[in-house]
Amino acid sequence: MKTLLEKTSDKLVKAFLKNKIIAPIPSKYTKKLSEAQKLRKLCESKIKEPIIGFKAAGTGIPLIKKFKEKEPFYASVYKRNFLKNGKSVKINKSTLGIELEVCYKIKKTFFSSKGQITMKNISKYISYMAPCIEIV
């Protein structure tokens, strides 16, 4: 029998892959960051699409303190979600807002790197830095 975490991740992955809107997920995954991270990792492990970069979140110090985190958190950016200039994005009545973000397109060598990634060597793995939006 599947756990709530597995059922929720299955629903999210299916919705992502089919580009569908679903009912809200259980609030335990939106109220507690550790639960949200578990769900994110499980969902990302089930999506077998090319990852081209990562999106950082929770980068503001007040937000980090509010959530009692030690560092910002991140999520994968998939190739299918990277749109060229002039493309459109679907929104509906459930859309709460659009947030301006910064994203980094990561070189493929990053994913096969065996060494430690540090602040001094991270720039060699970044192809582009760009503005991006997040539909909330």
Descriptions of predicted regions:
Residues 2-136:
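Catalytic-core "active-site belt" of small-molecule-metabolizing enzymes
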